[in-house]
C-alpha cells in the first residue's frame, strides 16, 4: 500500500537540466505527525466578525488518523470557537476508510493496493452521492460524481465530471463541471490552467485551488491524506481560467515561504481581477506548520 508521506529529506543538487528534473523526482517518505493550516480573515465592516480558520491533519505511521476544522470568531471582546472534528476509521487491511463528521455525514472510500481511493459512497441525512476516481500513471485524472435522487423523488440522477491533465508530473489544467445555478451564465465547462514553478513538492502538498474545485471539494481530507493519487512534482505558482475577455481577466499567483530546510511555512495567494477599466486584488496568507 502506498502511504502518504509529507515531510522533507535533505536536498541534494545534481548536475541535471531543468527538463530532466521535471521528468521525475524521487522523494523519500519521511515521518509526519501533524499538518496545520491557519488563516486569519479580517472583517471589512462594522458588525462583521474577524475569523481565524484552522485545518489540522493528524497522522500515525503515515496514515491520516484525525482531522479538525476550527473557526475562531471574534466580535469586539467576544470570541467563540467552533470546532468540526472528523472521525476516521479504517477497514480490514486498510482496504477501505470511512470519514464521519459531527452531524453523521459519512464518506466511505474503497482503497486499492496503492492506498488510492477508487470509489466513494457519500451519505448525509437527506442525500446520497457516488464517486469514482480514475488514475493515469498514479496521477488522479478524473473524478465522476452521481447525485442520487432523494427517496420517493422522480428526479433523475445528476452527473458531474472533473478532469485533470498533467505534464511530466505537474498539473497543467482542470476542467470542472458547470453547476445548475451556473447554466444561465453561458460558462459551460470551466477550464483552469496551472503553472508549475521550480520548487520541488517534497512535502507533497495539494494545490489549494484544486482541493476547493467541485466536486473534488467533497474530498478535501482524502486529498490531503494522499488517498487521491501521486502529488504534483513541483509547487504550483499560478492559475488562471482558460476563458477570459477584454472585459474580464483573472490570474492567481501562489508564493511559498520556506525555512532553512526548504519546509513550507506560509503560502501567499494573490488573485488579480480586471474588468477592462480597473484592476482589483484579493490577497490571502496561510500559515503552514508541519511536524
Residue positions per predicted region:
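C-terminal motif of bacterial Sec signal peptides marking the signal peptidase cleavage site
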Residues: 12-15
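Positively charged n-region of N-terminal signal peptides that target proteins for export
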Residues: 1-4
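Buried hydrophobic residues that stabilize the cores of well-folded domains
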Residues: 19-291
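Sec-dependent N-terminal signal peptides
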Residues: 7-8
Amino acid at each position: 500500500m502506498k502511504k502518504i508521506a509529507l515531510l522533507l529529506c535533505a536536498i541534494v543538487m545534481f548536475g541535471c537540466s531543468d527538463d530532466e528534473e521535471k521528468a521525475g523526482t524521487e522523494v523519500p517518505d519521511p515521518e509526519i505527525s501533524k499538518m496545520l493550516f491557519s488563516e486569519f480573515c479580517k472583517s471589512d465592516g462594522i458588525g462583521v466578525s474577524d475569523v481565524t480558520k484552522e485545518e489540522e491533519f493528524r497522522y500515525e505511521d503515515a496514515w491520516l488518523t484525525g482531522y479538525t476544522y476550527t473557526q475562531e470568531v471574534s466580535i469586539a471582546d467576544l470570541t467563540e470557537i467552533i470546532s468540526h472534528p472528523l472521525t476516521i476509521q479504517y477497514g480490514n487491511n486498510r482496504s477501505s476508510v470511512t470519514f464521519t463528521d459531527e452531524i453523521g455525514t459519512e464518506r466511505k472510500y474503497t482503497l486499492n493496493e496503492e492506498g488510492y481511493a477508487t470509489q466513494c459512497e457519500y451519505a448525509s441525512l437527506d442525500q446520497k452521492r457516488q464517486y469514482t476516481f480514475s488514475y493515469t500513471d498514479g496521477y488522479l485524472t478524473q473524478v465522476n460524481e452521481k447525485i442520487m435522487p432523494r427517496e420517493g423523488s422522480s428526479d433523475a440522477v445528476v452527473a458531474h465530471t472533473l478532469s485533470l491533465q498533467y505534464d511530466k508530473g505537474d498539473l497543467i489544467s482542470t476542467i470542472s463541471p458547470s453547476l445548475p445555478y451556473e447554466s444561465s451564465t453561458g460558462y459551460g465547462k470551466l477550464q483552469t490552467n496551472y503553472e508549475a514553478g521550480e520548487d520541488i513538492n517534497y512535502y507533497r502538498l495539494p494545490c489549494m485551488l484544486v482541493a476547493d474545485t467541485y466536486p473534488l471539494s467533497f474530498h478535501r481530507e482524502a486529498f490531503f491524506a494522499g488517498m487521491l493519487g501521486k502529488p504534483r512534482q513541483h509547487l504550483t505558482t499560478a492559475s488562471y481560467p482558460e476563458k477570459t475577455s477584454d472585459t474580464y481577466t483573472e490570474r492567481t499567483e501562489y508564493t511559498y515561504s520556506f525555512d532553512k530546510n526548504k519546509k513550507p511555512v506560509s503560502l501567499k495567494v494573490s488573485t488579480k481581477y480586471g474588468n477592462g477599466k480597473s484592476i482589483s486584488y484579493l490577497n490571502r496568507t496561510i500559515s503552514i506548520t508541519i511536524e
